[in-house]
Amino acid sequence: NHINAVRTCHYPDQIPWYYLCDKEGIYMIAETNLETHGSWGKAATLDDTWNVPGSVPEWEAMTLDRAKTQFEVLKNHTAILIWSLGNESFVGETLCKMDQYYRNQDPDRLVHYEGVFWQPEYKSRMSDIESRMYAYPKDIREYLEKEADKPFILCEYMHDMGNSMGGLNTYMNLIDEYDMYQ
């Protein structure tokens, strides 16, 4: 079935899972316990002063504490290839500081964050990977053919709603076609 990697979405998992992945050679994206889905804007507009954690200084200590806790608990697990800053928490200076924390503590592992997609001006400052959720295959192909300066991971897709796994073969065909896509 060609599965060799997992993402611990949307927060760290039970410790036995990490030991199992270490033992069986399964690569992991270890995701920080941070999700602020639904608090990105007000009145249907994106507003940097409203985003949580965004660039709001009051959220910096809390988000860094979550990154530090995850790092200290999981740093010795060999299965972890990538640290993830969290899930659907928009983007901003606070997340840039989390990215920098992981890089300072563990320069040999990659950093992942999907939310940078929403504000491309942060792409040069965080995440080693271009990552999106529920992107259409045509958008993935467009990135891989025109912009591919970072590997692309579709970190969440085929949600079991609506078409319920319909079209999976289209995503799998792209994986076979492009080396920079997982």
Task: Report the location of each language-model feature.
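Phosphate-binding active sites in nucleotide-utilizing proteins
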Residues: H2
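Substrate-binding/catalytic cleft of secreted carbohydrate-active enzymes
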Residues: A5-Q182
